Amino acid sequence: MYLIYLRLVFCCALLLGCGDNSKFDSATDLPVEQEQEQETEQEGEPEESSEQDLVEEVDWKDIPVPADAGPNMKWEFQEISDNFEYEAPADNKGSEFLEKWDDFYHNAWAGPGLTEWKRDRSYVADGELKMWATRKPGSDKINMGCITSKTRVVYPVYIEARAKVMNSTLASDVWLLSADDTQEIDILEAYGADYSESAGKDHSYFSKKVHISHHVFIRDPFQDYQPKDAGSWFEDGTVWNKEFHRFGVYWRDPWHLEYYIDGVLVRTVSGKDIIDPKHFTNTTDPGNTEIDTRTGLNKEMDIIINTEDQTWRSSPASGLQSNTYTPTDNELSNIENNTFGVDWIRIYKPVEK
């Protein structure tokens, strides 16, 4: 149980989007800047009366799912959800944790960039999943945590995590990935630090953004498509490392994704031209745009929660130190800043009423 703030908003802007093993590979994946739509007030209404805040104690299972389940449908809670109300020490997670999770990535890969995922860098205590980052002794590598669900999910499904982004230049992530690493949905990807010692400059450009996107891949030769419009980097003025927030996605079908933050729809991507414009999901001759056998995001996916250093940030293509966003030893010495917390993750399927 925890306190959430439900807002009745009478005038709101609906933000609709056009849409390394994974994640970013170069600075070209940064957002195209565009002016954010602003909320407009109803004429004649004072700002104070445009919304009212209601404070209510709600169990995590009973918080309304913000997505529409569809005509004559309702949301059904799935038992693979986890509120982490148990103890799972870093070096011996125990049966309750291991029933739902493996404390590593979904294959033997140890992570991108300077990342080195370790089983003992995640634990459950005080009602939270926690992951922390430390320098690997005698190395530039960074030891970090990663867990993978033992049950896969597939559309139609709503997935939402309540998490607190690290106050770090490292990535805090909640995402989905198919077993063959060809389809990916990013629910949360954020870099929470306000300042980067390695770059020697302000980092608030990133600390105020959440990356919400998807990828389709061809693995050999490696090719990666993801939307690069500004809508894939959500921003509303919030600095995401300050408190817990809810990050969710409704994976309605292979061609439709809806992203929600704190229960508000912030991005929709829908249709073949935004999900897979390069025909990477063709069942025959992937990448050949002369034929169309695209499947879209149709594969079962693992749920992955992790922290990571990413190649495009620690080894930028420019080679410039001013573009190098990886934590220094001094920054890593602050364990609190480099700890990612997840209060819960919940999964729902639409079923007939």
From Swiss-Prot:
Region (Disordered), start-end ranges: 30-58
UniProtKB keywords: Cell outer membrane, Glycosidase, Hydrolase, Lipoprotein, Membrane, Palmitate, Signal
EC number: 3.2.1.81
Induction: When cells are grown with the low sulfated agar.
Predominant subcellular localization, coarse grouping: membrane
Residue spans of biased composition, Acidic residues class: 32-58
UniProt superkingdom: Bacteria
GO CC annotation: cell outer membrane
Residues of the GH16 domain: 58-353
Effect of residue 189 to D: Abolishes beta-agarase activity
One Pfam family linked to the record: Glyco_hydro_16
Subcellular location: Cell outer membrane
Catalytic residues (UniProt): 184 (nucleophile), 189 (proton donor)
Lipidation (S-diacylglycerol cysteine): 18
Membrane disposition: Lipid-anchor
Lipidation positions, renumbered (N-palmitoyl cysteine): 18
Signal peptide, first to last residue: 1-17
Subunit field text: Homodimer.
Protein name: Beta-agarase B
Organism, as annotated: Zobellia galactanivorans (strain DSM 12802 / CCUG 47099 / CIP 106680 / NCIMB 13871 / Dsij)
Protein encoded by which gene: agaB
